[in-house]
């Protein structure tokens, strides 16, 4: 902590450090804002239920989109690997023909 304070002081100079020091006397914004403070959902009632339903629908839709993208990715991978298999099988056949030709030419 002392090392980081010295680094800040070196970068900001005297006036920058004074600003950092005076900010400590006020209420910290992260402490004053509770997570969800003043939110409609905490108040309960119809608005809270509606907000929760909208959030759930949003996340279900995002999940659907992500799964669709993942499915497409896997289908593309399968297609790519199938084409690669075909290409390699053609090469194997080509090499087998060369070997067969070489065996026949030896005799």
Curated annotation (Swiss-Prot):
Name by which UniProt lists this protein: ATPase inhibitor, mitochondrial
Keywords noted in UniProt: Coiled coil, Mitochondrion, Phosphoprotein, Transit peptide
Report which superkingdom the organism of origin falls in: Eukaryota
What is the similarity comment for this entry? Answer: Belongs to the ATPase inhibitor family.
Can you supply one Gene Ontology CC term for this chain's record? protein-containing complex
- Subunit and partners: Homodimer; represents the active form and is present at a pH value below 6.5. Homotetramer; represents the inactive form and is present at a pH value above 7.0.
Q: Does the keyword Mitochondrion apply?
A: yes
Name the gene that codes for it.
Atp5if1
Residues annotated as carrying Phosphoserine in the record are: 39
Q: Does the keyword Nucleotide-binding apply?
A: no
The function of this protein is: Endogenous F(1)F(o)-ATPase inhibitor limiting ATP depletion when the mitochondrial membrane potential falls below a threshold and the F(1)F(o)-ATP synthase starts hydrolyzing ATP to pump protons out of the mitochondrial matrix. Required to avoid the consumption of cellular ATP when the F(1)F(o)-ATP synthase enzyme acts as an ATP hydrolase. Indirectly acts as a regulator of heme synthesis in erythroid tissues: regulates heme synthesis by modulating the mitochondrial pH and redox potential, allowing FECH to efficiently catalyze the incorporation of iron into protoporphyrin IX to produce heme.
Which residues lie within the region annotated Antiparallel alpha-helical coiled coil region?
74-106
- Enumerate the transmembrane spans: none
Q: Where is the signal peptide?
A: none
């Amino acid at each position: 902590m002392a090392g980081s304070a010295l680094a800040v002081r070196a970068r900001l100079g005297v006036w920058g450090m004074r600003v950092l020091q005076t900010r400590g006397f006020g209420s910290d914004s992260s402490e004053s804002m509770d997570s969800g403070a003043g939110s409609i959902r905490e108040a309960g009632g119809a608005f809270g239920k509606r907000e929760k339903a909208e959030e759930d629908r949003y996340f279900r839709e995002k999940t659907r989109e992500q799964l669709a993208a993942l499915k497409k990715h896997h289908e593309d991978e399968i297609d790519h690997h199938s084409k690669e298999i075909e290409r390699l099988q053609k090469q194997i056949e080509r090499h087998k023909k060369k070997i067969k030709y070489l065996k026949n030419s030896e005799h």
